[in-house]
Amino acid sequence: GWPAYPGSNGIRSSVCQKKLGCGSKNLASLGVCKAFCPGRKRFWQKCGKNGSSGKGSRICNPVPAHAVEKAGKGLIKVTDMAVAAIAKYAGKK
């Protein structure tokens, strides 16, 4: 299924960052969010509510779009885990 259009407010980068809890747990996730959220915003601006720009653009394919929505959430989790691991490792030396 096509991911639900977040609404004109929901595509805002700041809303995306807040939703993902960017930088709230650790600052490293902020960088990931700052890369992910504007990209996501551009995607929705380009592809519109139904996920197709009408030009048959590959970027608007619902499959990668759905993956991107899920990956965004997963990305932050992974970043948090990686930073925790690095901090732990650095503390050992």
Curated annotation (Swiss-Prot):
MF terms in GO: toxin activity
Keywords: Cytolysis, Disulfide bond, Hemolysis, Secreted, Toxin
Subcellular location: Secreted
Coiled coil: none
One Gene Ontology cellular component annotation held by this UniProt entry: extracellular region
Expression sites by tissue: Localized within the skin and proboscis and are most readily isolated from body mucus secretions.
Cysteine pairs bridged by disulfides in the record: 16-37, 22-33, 47-60
GO biological process: killing of cells of another organism
Family according to the record: Belongs to the worm cytolysin family.
Purpose: Cytolysin that shows hemolytic activity (on bovine erythrocytes, HC(50)=5.75 mg/ml). This hemolytic activity is completely inhibited by small unilamelar vesicles composed of PC/PG, PC/PI and PC/PS in 1:1 molar ratios (with at least 100 mg/ml concentration).
Name of protein: Parbolysin P3
